[in-house]
Amino acid sequence: MSENNNDKITAKKTLTLKRSGSETNTVKQNFNHSRTKAVVVETKRRKIARPDEKTEMPQPITKPHVAPPRSKPRIEKPVLVTPTAQSNLSSTEMDARLRALEEAHIQDEIIRKQAAEKQIAERQAAEKQAKESEEGLHLQKTHKEKIQKSSSNTTKPTPLFSSTVSPIESIEAALTLKNTAASKRKADENDDDEKYNRRANLSKSEIRAPKIIKGTDERRRGKLTLNSALDEEGNSRGRSMAAMRRRQEKFKRAQNQEPREKISREVILPETITIQELAQRMAERSVDVIKFLMKQEQMMKPGDVIDADIAELIAIEFGHTVKRVSESDIEEGIFNVDDDPQKMKTRPPIVTIMGHVDHGKTSLLDAIRKANVVSSEAGGITQHIGAYQVEQNGQKITFIDTPGHAAFTAMRARGAQITDIAVLVVAADDSVMPQTIESINHAKAANVPIIVAINKIDKPTADAQKVRTELLQHEVFVETMGGETLEVEVSAKTGQNLDKLLEAILLQAEILDLKADSERTADGIVIEAKLDQGRGSVATVLVQKGTLHLSDIIVAGNEWGRIRALIDDHGNHIKTASPSTPVEILGMQGTPQAGDRFAVVAHEAKAREIAEYRQRLARDKAAARKTGSRSSLEQMMTKLQTVGVKEFSLIIKGDVQGSIEAITAALEKLGNEEVQTRIVHSGAGGITESDISLAETSNSVVIGFNVRANKQVRDLAETQGIEIRYYNIIYDLVDDIKAAMSGLLSPEKRETFLGNAEILEIFNITKIGKVAGCQVTEGKIERGAGVRLIRDNIVIHEGKLKTLKRFKDEVNEVQIGQECGIAFEKYEDMRAGDTIEIFRVEHVNRTL
C-alpha cells in the first residue's frame, strides 16, 4: 500500500475531516426497536512521539535548572539560575535540586515508554482491522461474482430495493463519496497522521457484513457483530441477536434433518407402568406411543396406567427389547440359598407331640424335661405352642408341644409342617378321639413319620390293645400288629418307659439322616409371637438352616428387625443358635404372625424394603376382600341376604398370637344366618386406650385373654361405658360369647291351639259394633287369644279377640259346649255359619 493520497488501494477511501488539536465528534448509538441517540464528544489530541519518528533530544545545558515533576498538581515556572545565584546555594540545596531533576527525567522516561507501548498496541490493532477489511472486500467481490453467475443461469428474482439502484451500486457510490471527501481533508495533514487515520477509518468503515440474498447456496461465514453490520453513520440497521439466534437454529435443524439410526434399548417393565414412564424408558415421545395406541383403538392419555403385557407389545413395536420384572423379585434369594454338601453336619431331630386334649401330652413332655409345665397352663390344658430341647445320651432332641383342643387346629397343622418326627400320644383308657384322628391326618399330609406313645398305661382301666386296634382303622400300623410304625407304652406319671421313647426317637432320626449346613445364613419358622410389656415384640422361632447370630437382621412375615437378644428354652442369653434350636428373639419392629418364615438378610435397607412390600401386599388383599368391586351374582345375592344379619363386634387382645388365632377360629364357628361375630381388631399385648376408643366407635366388647388393662384404661372404659371381659381358659370365653350372641337372636314364636267356635247369629250393638253369638265346639276360648275367621275352609281374617262375654258379663274363659259373644279388633265382616279358630302364641328364647 502506498502512503500517497493519489495511490489506489483495494477499497475506496473514507471521508475524513482534518483533525485539529481540539475536535468535536458525534457518536451515534443504536438501541433496540430502531431507537438511536447522538452524543457529542470533544477530544483533545496531544502530540505523541511515534516509534518510527526521529525525536530530537534537547541539548544539554551547562547550568541545570529545576523542573517540577508532572505528578504534582502545582507546577511552578522554572527559574533560570545564574552562576552568581548558584554560588550562593548551599550543598544541601544543590543536592535537593539534583535529585528533583533526576526524578523528573525518570518520570518522563516512564511516560515515554507507556506511550510507545500504547502506540504499538494501536498499530497492531489497526493492522489487524485492515487485514480483516481486505478479507471482507475479497468476500464481497467473490459474492458479487456468484450473483452474476447465478443471474445468468436462473431467472432474476424480484429485487428487494428500487429497480433503479442495486444494493451493490449504492454501496460503491457511498464509498466513492466518502473517499473523495477524505482526500480533501487529508491534504492538509502531515504524512504520518494521514497514514494512521486512513488505516483507522478504513477498519471502521469498510468492515461490513455482506448482504445475503435469498436463494443462494452461500456457506456460513464467521460470527457477525453489530459494529461490522452498520456503517459509520448508522444508516442501515443490523440483525438483532434474536434473529441471529433463530437463523443459527434454523441452520442446525436443516443439518439435523438427516434420518437418525434407530437405537434399540432394553426396557425394564414392572407389573404396571404409565404411558409417560414407558415412553421415557424407550427414549420415545409419548405422543408417538399415544398415536400407536389410537391405531389399536385404545384412547389413552400419557398418565394412564397399563399392564406389563400391553407395555411389552408397545416396546416390541418400537423396536426395543423387553425385560419384565416383578415387585416380588425383591424376595428372591432369601430362602433358596444352596447348602454346601461338604459342610453338612448332623442336626438334632425336631419332634412334635400331638394328640387329643387331656391325653397327657404336656405331662409326658414334663416328665422328659423334668419340669412342671402343666401347672403354669390355665385349666390344665396347653394354650400355647412351646418348644424345648432335651439331651439323651449326648444327643439333643427338640420337642414342640402343640395344643390338643379343637380350637387349636391351625397350631397342630403348623407343628406338623416344621417337624421331622410326630409323636402321637393316645391315652390307654380313652383310646382314639377326634383330635387324635386330626393329628394323624396332619402328620400324613406333612409326610412325617409317626411314633405312637400309648400313655396312662399305669391306670387300671388302660387297654393298650384297644388303642392298637382302633389305630388300624386310620391306617396307622404299629410294629406289634405287623406294621412299620414304632410304638411305646409309657406313663408320664410314673416315668415308665420314657427312655425307650427317647431311644425310639433317636433311632427314627438316624434312619432319616437329618443334616444341615450350619455356616450358611439362617432361616426358619416363627413358632409363636407375643407383645411383652417392657421387652417389646418377642418371637419364639425355630432355626431350621444355618446359624442365627446376635445382631443379625431378619425378616419375618410383614415385620423386620435386628436381633437384640437370643434366649434359649431355659431363659439363658446366648449368642448363636444352631440348626434345630428353638430360641426367643427380641428386637422385632412389630409382632409377626405364628407360622411366618424368617430369614437373615444382608442389610437393613433390603429388610425394610421386603417388609414394606409384604405389608403393601397384605393391605391390597384386605382391600380387595373388603370392596370386592367385581362380585359374582351369587356373591351379590348373598350380600343382600346378609344385610339384616346382626353382628356381635369383638376386640380380642391376647398374650400370644397363636391363642388369638385359636380364639378367632372358634368364634367364627358360632354364627348362623341371623347373628355372626365380627372381629374388629385382634392383637398380642395388653389392652390399651386405643382399644377402648376403637370399641366405642365400633360398639364392640373388649376381651382380654391372659392380659389385663391398667388403671387408666379401666377408668376410660368405665367413663365411656365399654365392657372389658377377662379370660384365661378358652372354654369359658367361647361359652360366654355363645350365650351373649344367643341374646341377639329373635325369639321363636310357638303357636298353641286352644279350640274352635261356630257363629250362630250376628248382633249389632250400639258403641260396640257387630258381635257374633257363638257356641264352643272344641277346646276352649281364652280372652286375649289370637283368632282366625274361617269361611268355606278358607282363612279370611286373622287377628285378636276384642271382647268375650257370657250373659252380658266379661269372662276370661269359655269352655266347650257353652255359648258366648265374640267381637274382633277392627273387623266386622262376620257371617252366620263361619268358624272361629282360637290359638295362643308363645315367644321362646333361642340359643346357638
From Swiss-Prot:
GO molecular function, one term: guanosine tetraphosphate binding
UniProt name for this protein: Translation initiation factor IF-2
Region annotation (G3) ranges: 401-404
Biased composition (Basic and acidic residues): 1-10, 121-138
Gene Ontology cellular component terms for the protein in this record: cytosol
Record's compositionally biased regions (Polar residues): 17-33, 149-163
Compartments, record wording: Cytoplasm
Classification lineage: Bacteria, Pseudomonadati, Pseudomonadota, Alphaproteobacteria, Hyphomicrobiales
Positions annotated to bind GTP: 355-362, 401-405, 455-458
Keywords: Cytoplasm, GTP-binding, Initiation factor, Nucleotide-binding, Protein biosynthesis
Residues annotated as domain tr-type G: 346-513
SUPFAM superfamilies listed in its UniProt record: Initiation factor IF2/eIF5b, domain 3, P-loop containing nucleoside triphosphate hydrolases, Translation proteins
Coiled coil: none
Organism: Bartonella bacilliformis (strain ATCC 35685 / KC583 / Herrer 020/F12,63)
Region annotation G1: where it falls in the sequence: 355-362
Region described as G5: spans on this chain: 491-493
